[in-house]
């Protein structure tokens, strides 16, 4: 399983390699034992071999049973891996499809939102543009309404006055006939008076001017001719009296004519002004009513337009809120699904860890049984060699089990040294050769190799930091035996915090989906002896590596004696 505990980590996997080497120490024998010792030794060997054969058969059956159980567990593990990969693939496909659908829906919603925002901005601009006109029209409408109310009040007053005047008119119709006659007379009189007034005014002006001139002349004459004035004073008084009387008589007659004429003209002007005022008032009232109706209709239209724009704006806002609510709901739903998937994956990983632990335990048991079988094989080969039943037997047998992802360590197992005594009195000391493999993992920096598949299908690189890391130009190299394969990331490749990128072999059947999944072209990760993997940065420096080291040691203890089955 993967581990993310620091920037520099080291993981060691220890595996036993068992081999048998015989170190023989010759003991002294005495030829005096004779045939009795030989027969006794052969009987003991027969009983011992019978017991060993029985135990060997039991161990063979147990080994076969464990191999069958191992095969069954491997089949179960492969089935679980297939189901997990299928579920991951299906879940990833469904997630990508749903993600694409949501992205399309989000793009559509954003397009509609942009369109609605444009319409809303245009509507706001139009509303701002129309708002002064509406306010002006409302003011004009208020003024028109006030004028209409004032005109209505005036009209009501006029109607009341009209009724009163109509009543009075009926009463005055009779008087009108008399007044018409008097009007004609008075009109003539007014005309005469007007003319008289005009003439009298002219005469008065002329007289005043003349009087002033005469007064000036008189003053001058008085100053120069005081004496003559006294002489002609009496005569001048008579002349002035006569002249004043004549002027007064003319003035009185002309004034009366002018007054009559002015009265007639005033009445005519009054009637004309009244008629013109009523016509102008009616025309203005009709025009005001028409403007009022137009202003009311335009105000109603503008208010309806404003209401439509406000309704459209509120509808767009509600649509945006609804889309945001749906998007939040979908995000929460997918987050819950992702949490459920992560929980399921964690459960599967725990199950896999448990099964792998059981598998390793069974593997340890198998190794112990292999060691026990090797021990008994050595004993049987010693007897066969002693009895000259075979000439040669293999001395060392080693079984390699190397895995990149092994997480624990298998301890050495051994007990007391076994000693075999042959018929010649020679004893054999058996030492066991232990071979260990050590898996070292080193990481410098936040990015490193996280895990390597045992079957050589994929290699995972992970970012263990809280920040985004660029791995553009990084090169991943895996070696096993004489084989080597490499993969280089693109120059724009970046890893999100705690994210990983998995590089699959070309024949693994994975789908290329950057930046999480990469599939190599015509290359496979190698499998073989002495496997190693390293991650190089863009400058060629190694930032993470995994290597396997082997070590051998001899141990006189027998691993089989610690077998729980024994």
Curated annotation (Swiss-Prot):
Residues 229-256 are annotated as: Linker 2. Residues 13-47 are annotated as: Head. GO terms for biological process: determination of adult lifespan; embryo development ending in birth or egg hatching; germ cell development; heterochromatin formation; nuclear envelope organization; nuclear migration; nuclear migration along microtubule; nuclear pore localization. Ubiquitous. Expressed in all cells, except in cells undergoing spermatogenesis. Residues 257-385 are annotated as: Coil 2. Keywords: Acetylation, Coiled coil, Intermediate filament, Lipoprotein, Membrane, Methylation, Nucleus, Prenylation. It is a lipid-anchor. InterPro entries: IF_rod_dom, Lamin_tail_dom, Lamin_tail_dom_sf. Residues 564-566 form a propeptide. It is found in: Nucleus envelope; Nucleus inner membrane. A lipid is attached at residue 563 (S-farnesyl cysteine). It comes from Caenorhabditis elegans. GO terms for molecular function: histone binding; identical protein binding; structural constituent of cytoskeleton; structural molecule activity. This is Lamin-1. PROSITE patterns: IF_ROD_2, LTD. Residues 1-37, 528-566 are annotated as: Disordered. Belongs to the intermediate filament family. Residues 48-82 are annotated as: Coil 1A. Residues 541-556 have a biased composition (Polar residues). Residues 386-566 are annotated as: Tail. The gene is lmn-1. Residues 95-228 are annotated as: Coil 1B. Residues 45-387 form the IF rod domain. Interacts with LEM domain proteins lem-2 and emr-1. May interact with unc-84; this interaction may be required to complete the connection between the nuclear lamina and the cytoskeleton.
